[in-house]
């Protein structure tokens, strides 16, 4: 993981989805591209959080294709390594999970549906 907030190209749909009642905030790319077998996600744990977060990439059937490690507040991860190649247009789910820092109890999860948007030119 890297410190701070990333500088993300506009075409990757980087945003901060938030649902009422969530105990943490995060940012992630809605338009996921592939770079050498890795998904470009820019998962960012907001600086004001206390929760640790991680991201799983799932296929349409819920099978896990890859996941990040735990990311601390004010850190981000650009890539998630994938277990298989995903062609452009493949439907995927990004599952973001939060954990309380001392107990590792769940701090809630959010799932975003998206598709692979092609090869990264980053």
Identify the residue ranges that each predicted region occupies.
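Transition segment at domain starts
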Residues: 1-34, 115-121
């Amino acid at each position: 993981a890297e410190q701070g907030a990333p500088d993300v190209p506009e075409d990757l749909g980087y945003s901060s989805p938030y649902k009422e009642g969530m105990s943490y905030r995060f940012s992630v790319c809605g338009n996921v591209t592939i770079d050498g077998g890795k998904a470009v996600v820019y998962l960012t744990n907001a600086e004001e959080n206390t929760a640790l977060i991680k991201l799983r990439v799932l296929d349409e059937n819920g099978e896990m294709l890859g996941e990040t490690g735990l990311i601390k507040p004010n850190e981000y991860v650009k890539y998630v390594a994938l277990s298989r190649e995903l062609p452009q247009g493949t439907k995927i789910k990004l599952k973001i999970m939060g954990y309380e820092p001392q107990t590792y109890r769940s701090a809630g999860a959010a799932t975003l549906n998206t598709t692979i948007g092609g090869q990264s030119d980053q």
